[in-house]
């Protein structure tokens, strides 16, 4: 397990939660392709040195799928990752109609266990356009390799990862393990981000509450089954076609 985690997590100065979704085993015996799809905290924090690290590892991102709200995107420069033109920025807000409420976002980020899972399920109800846009892009091989991300890489990114991995036939145990790999930013990184965003540095004191707790994802997955029946039913309700779902599987699975 340790070797897998080391291979999955990319050590970068700007982003603490940049990792590869490759290697997870699907129920049909296939595995998720390595170096094809990544999840992360906001790519705006990547440094020039980080880009060199990615290049040295043979990682070239064709696209970045930004799950943040319009307010978050407008608040700060999109980052050096997009400056060269090699990586295209695609804005796919997870909740386009309500995410500018910072207090509500903080409440969601800090909740754990059953409350955290229920919060996730409420947010999911607004995410149909996001999933439709993301799956349409992942079904197009020319839009890969890519990374999707929110602010911290935990909540919105965690929900997208759960739905995506379920689509690929990955077990709930592996999905929960992937969620739990998400680490809270270091205090130094948090303080730097708060300063760059013009936010209250005292928010950095909540580092412990920003960690990803497995029980939150457990409750989310159980509630997802209760509300939606299956991942296919959920995706179809987002107006994602069966052929699109199958192309996503073909692009992201091997073996």
Per-segment meaning from a language model:
Residues 152, 156-157:
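Ser/Thr-glycine-rich phosphate-binding loops at phosphate-binding pockets of nucleotides
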Residues 1-147, 159-255:
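Cys-dependent protein tyrosine phosphatase-like superfamily
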């Amino acid at each position: 397990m340790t070797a897998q985690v080391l291979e999955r997590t990319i050590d970068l100065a700007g982003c603490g939660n940049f990792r590869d979704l490759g290697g997870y085993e699907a129920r049909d015996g296939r595995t998720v392709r390595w170096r094809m799809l990544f999840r992360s905290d906001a790519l705006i924090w990547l440094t020039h040195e980080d880009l060199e690290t990615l290049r040295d590892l043979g990682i070239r991102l064709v696209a970045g799928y930004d799950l943040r709200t319009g307010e978050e995107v407008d608040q700060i420069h999109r980052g050096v990752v997009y400056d060269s033109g090699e990586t295209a920025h695609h804005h796919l807000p997870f909740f386009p109609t309500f995410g500018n409420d910072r207090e509500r976002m903080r409440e969601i980020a800090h909740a754990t266990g059953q409350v955290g899972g229920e919060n996730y399920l409420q947010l999911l109800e607004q995410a149909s356009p996001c999933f439709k846009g993301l799956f349409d892009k992942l079904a197009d091989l020319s839009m890969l390799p890519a990374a999707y991300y929110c602010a911290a890489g935990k909540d919105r990114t965690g929900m997208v990862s759960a739905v995506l991995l379920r689509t690929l036939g990955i077990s709930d145990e592996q999905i929960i393990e992937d969620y739990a790999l998400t680490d809270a930013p270091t205090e130094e990184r948090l303080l730097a981000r708060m300063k760059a965003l013009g936010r209250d540095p005292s928010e950095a004191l909540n580092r412990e509450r920003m960690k990803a707790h497995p029980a939150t994802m457990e409750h989310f997955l159980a509630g997802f089954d209760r509300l939606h029946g299956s991942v296919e039913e959920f995706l179809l309700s987002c107006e994602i076609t069966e052929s699109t779902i199958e192309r996503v599987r073909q692009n992201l699975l091997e073996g």
